[in-house]
Regions:
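Short, intrinsically disordered, charge-balanced linker/junction segments flanking boundaries
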Residues: 178-181
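Conserved, well-structured core segments that form or line functional sites
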Residues: 134-137
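Beta-propeller and closely related beta-pinwheel folds
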Residues: 1-132, 147-173
Length: 181
């Protein structure tokens, strides 16, 4: 790594997440307050020392936000919400920034339909935002789930699609006026 003495603003950055255990980074999401780092055991906010300040080799602070770890499913960002799969694979979490508490908080959005999630994992999902605000998720047994997520309208619902076949993957193709599944 490129490190000068004394430290320069363009030097490599290294930070230790003081969790007391080994954690594997699953994804890093840039947000207005700072970087959100999802590991297999928790989530962390990394800033330059204060919210919104630049991160540098001499200005870096990591604070744990949640004890719900993430799996390998890439997070989906919807407006100010980050949706991610839990490390154990049987639930989907919604994480967003609470400006009052100055912390990312989360809730289990799969709890409302836990029978669709118990003992299953999700190898793939895709966001079809327009026009119906759907998220398509493929379950490890080949069942396709759809998730309508309109948080600003306080509406979310899960359903499963009954077909004669099994799904192995899902993709969304953006078009001129809507996303195609």
């Amino acid at each position: 790594y490129n490190v000068s003495s004394p430290i320069q603003a363009d030097d490599a950055i290294s930070v230790t997440l003081a969790s007391g255990q080994l954690e594997t980074i699953k994804s890093i999401i840039p947000t207005a307050p700072g970087l959100i780092v999802y590991t297999d055991k928790s989530s962390w906010m990394v800033t330059g020392g204060s919210l919104g300040s630049a991160i540098g080799p001499s200005a870096i602070v990591a604070q744990r936000q949640s004890l719900v770890g993430a799996n390998d499913l890439p997070p989906i960002i919807r407006n100010f919400d980050i949706l991610y799969g839990s490390y154990l694979g049987s639930s989907i979490w919604d994480s967003n920034y609470n400006y009052y508490a100055q912390i990312f908080t989360g809730s289990d959005v799969s709890e409302i339909s836990s029978h669709l999630f118990y003992d299953f994992s999700f190898p793939q999902w895709a966001d079809a935002f327009a026009p119906f605000r759907l998220i398509w998720a493929v379950r490890n047994d080949g069942v396709l789930l759809s998730f309508t997520f309109a948080k600003e309208e306080q509406f979310m619902a899960w359903s499963h699609c009954i077909t004669a076949g099994n799904f192995t993957s899902v993709a969304v193709v953006p078009e001129a006026t809507a996303d195609s599944e």
